[in-house]
């Protein structure tokens, strides 16, 4: 419910009691009435504007309308000041951080004018109280400005984009994202191919210079069933003199019945020392007699042929010939992983 609250004004009768002219008293009486202020509260239409202070000219407009029309050209209108504080939100909002807009309207004797001071946020519409456009000179929202017929350039501009343009823009963005993803995948695949190609080139470079030596050294022993490949830096077969020492081996429990005899040796092959122990494999007539170093009659016939092949491969590469590589030797001269025992002391 709307209501008026009288606030009162200053009385200037003490300053003008001595004036005798009737016109002066009339003007003085009008000036006293203009000094009265009324507090206007509108709880129905302007819920979010709170209390506003207005001069009595707004409420006495119909009463003095004829007098103002008669005195329009004779004298200037009376001075009045109006101000109000408008919160940006509704009155039901309990947020203490609401921005408020303080506006003043000043009408002087010569030129009317107005200005608005905004603090911590935008202004409210003067008609509906909603958020007003920031650059609107009429301080109204888009709907009220349009309904009143104001030619506001701020409300003409709009950031709304048609649906067709929005779809076109989204399609362009999707195509760009797909293109960028495909280009990244292509670059990654190219890098992987370059990396694998570089490794293959390195292998070709390493194998190109020593082609004949690699062909001679990477030979699988046909006599053995293990199928192991010989190292690139070691000859496939070696014949070298060696000293075998007879040693006594036993189990961990050191049982006398489990004691046996074996031979320990160490040979130099290709600049590497190979040590091991040869265990007793049984009588010579068994199937594994070729593992014994004493039965080497079959391998001695291939000494000249193996030496010729090795010398030919080494001469092509310009490498120094290792004398130990000219003689074949059994690949199973020792068993890897066997313990090493020192010769018994005498």
Curated annotation (Swiss-Prot):
Biased composition (Polar residues): 175-186
Entry keyword annotation includes DNA-binding: yes
Main location: nucleus
Keyword Phosphoprotein: no
Alphabetical UniProt keywords: Activator, Auxin biosynthesis, Auxin signaling pathway, Developmental protein, DNA-binding, Metal-binding, Nucleus, Zinc
Residue sites binding Zn(2+) 1 per the record: 125, 128, 136, 141
Region listing for Disordered, in residue ranges: 7-31, 175-215
Annotated Basic and acidic residues bias: 18-31, 187-207
Chain location of the short sequence motif Required for homo- and heterodimerization per the record: 269-272
DNA-binding region in chain numbering: 125-152
Listed GO MF terms: DNA-binding transcription factor activity; metal ion binding; sequence-specific DNA binding
BP terms from Gene Ontology: anther development; auxin biosynthetic process; auxin-activated signaling pathway; photomorphogenesis; pollen development
Gene inactivation effect: No visible phenotype.
GO CC annotations, alphabetized: nucleus
Subcellular localization: Nucleus
Family, per entry: Belongs to the SHI protein family.
Record function comment: Transcription activator that binds DNA on 5'-ACTCTAC-3' and promotes auxin homeostasis-regulating gene expression (e.g. YUC genes), as well as genes affecting stamen development, cell expansion and timing of flowering. Synergistically with other SHI-related proteins, regulates gynoecium, stamen and leaf development in a dose-dependent manner, controlling apical-basal patterning. Promotes style and stigma formation, and influences vascular development during gynoecium development. May also have a role in the formation and/or maintenance of the shoot apical meristem (SAM).
Entry protein name: Protein SHI RELATED SEQUENCE 5
Gene that encodes it: SRS5
């Amino acid at each position: 419910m709307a209501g008026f609250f009288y606030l009162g004004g200053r009385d200037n009768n003490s300053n003008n009691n001595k004036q005798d002219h009737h016109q002066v008293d009339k003007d003085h009486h009008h000036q006293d009435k203009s000094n009265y202020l009324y507090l206007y509260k509108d709880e129905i239409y302007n819920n979010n504007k709170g209390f506003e202070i207005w001069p009595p000219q707004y409420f006495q407009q119909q009463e003095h309308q004829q007098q103002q029309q008669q005195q329009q050209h004779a004298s200037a209108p009376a001075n009045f000041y109006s101000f109000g504080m408008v919160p940006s939100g509704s009155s039901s909002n309990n947020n203490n951080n609401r921005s408020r807009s303080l506006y003043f309207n000043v009408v002087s004797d010569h030129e009317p004018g107005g200005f608005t001071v905004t603090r911590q946020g935008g202004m409210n519409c003067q008609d509906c109280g909603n958020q007003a456009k920031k650059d609107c000179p009429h301080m109204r929202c888009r709907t009220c400005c349009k309904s009143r017929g104001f030619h506001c350039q701020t409300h003409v501009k709009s950031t709304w984009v048609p649906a067709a343009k929005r779809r076109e823009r989204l399609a362009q963005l999707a195509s760009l994202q797909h293109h960028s993803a495909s280009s990244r995948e292509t670059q990654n695949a190219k890098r992987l191919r370059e990396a694998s190609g570089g490794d293959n080139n390195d292998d070709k470079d390493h194998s190109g210079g020593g082609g004949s030596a690699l062909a001679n050294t990477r030979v699988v022993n046909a006599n053995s069933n293990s199928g192991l490949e010989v190292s690139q830096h070691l000859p496939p077969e070696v014949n070298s003199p060696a000293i075998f020492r007879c040693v006594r081996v036993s189990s961990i429990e050191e049982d006398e019945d489990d004691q046996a005899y074996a031979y320990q040796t160490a040979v130099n092959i290709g600049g590497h020392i190979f040590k091991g122990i040869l265990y007793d494999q049984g009588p010579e007539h068994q199937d594994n007699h070729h593992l014994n170093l004493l039965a080497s009659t079959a391998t001695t016939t291939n000494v000249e042929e193996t030496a010729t092949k090795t010398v030919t491969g080494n001469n092509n590469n310009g490498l120094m010939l290792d004398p130990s590589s000219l003689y074949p030797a059994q690949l199973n001269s020792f068993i890897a992983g066997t313990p090493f025992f020192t010769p018994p002391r005498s």
